Amino acid sequence: MKKPLLFFSFQILVLLLVAQPYVDPFQVRYTYAFRSGGNSRGTPFTHLWAGSDLPIKIKNNTYLLLSPFYENWQIDSASVKNIQPTVHSIALPIGLIVPLKNKKWTMVINPILRTNGEELFAKNTFQLGGVGFFGYERSPGQKIRFGAYMNSDFFGFFFMPLLGADWKMDERNYFFGLLPGRFTWEHKFNSHLFGGMTFRAITNSYRLNDGQYLRIDDNQLSTYLDVYPAKNICFTLEPGYGILRKLRTGTEKKIYTTTDKWGDGFFIKLSAAYRVRLKK
């Protein structure tokens, strides 16, 4: 009985904490952006991300969701390798579900501690931020979420309101996410094949060894195909296009010494995950 009860508690936790129909106890993603010509002159880069979601029950109706992750950016130019130094990040988001009296409402607090830089754990590489949002269940399978993201970025205090949904349209179509961070449409072809479209907005800053910071902005629109060769194993192929990209460096908050248009362009993302799909 212990295994089914553990899985049931795991499902309840994730249903409350995440706006998606699945959870990944482990996932790794690799993105390769192609060089492009024309006016946009897309800059090639690689991005590696690896992370997990680890649930912990601390007392009745109160849960933690630890979501540590690592990422790595390598950015090139048309003629020069590593136009910017390789930068890394290690982050520890800690999601806390706070029970409310009205069962239609949930509140989630998710502080995030991270080290971002050319060297990890070096001086002036630490950032503190977080996400907080409320969720309201209009009806079974229809949830609305709203809140805010904030972070002590090296370019200054970053604040962004959030609005999202966790919406099961029918047995095959699902919309989920929090904008402007990420929003996804998922379509179920069969139990082994899912697909759809995803939008991601990325804003991060990293401390360089010369004391400056690097700010990375990207907006990615992509289609994807999830293949499940086994129940909990998922491989993803995700081609897409990045727009309104910018690379900026600076030494003081809100003051940039360089601003480069990163260049719009195509990318391909490959992912592998141990995934638990949730019954919603």
Predicted regions and their residues:
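Residues that define the transmembrane beta-barrel architecture of outer-membrane proteins
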Residues: 44-50, 84-90, 122-128, 157-161, ...
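Repeated loop/turn-to-beta-strand initiation elements of outer-membrane beta-barrel proteins
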Residues: 59-65, 102-107, 141-146, 172-175, ...
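Sequence/structural signature of outer-membrane beta-barrel proteins
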Residues: 33-37, 71-80, 99, 112-120, ...
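Transmembrane beta-barrel strands of outer-membrane/channel proteins
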Residues: 26-32, 66-72, 109-113, 146-150, ...
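Outer membrane beta-barrel transmembrane domains
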Residues: 175, 192-257
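Short glycine/proline- and aromatic-enriched beta-strand/turn motifs that initiate or cap beta-hairpins
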Residues: 20-78, 277
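Outer-membrane beta-barrel "beta-signal"
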Residues: 162-168, 225, 262-280
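Residue-level signature of outer-membrane beta-barrel architecture
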Residues: 54-58, 96-100, 136, 167, ...
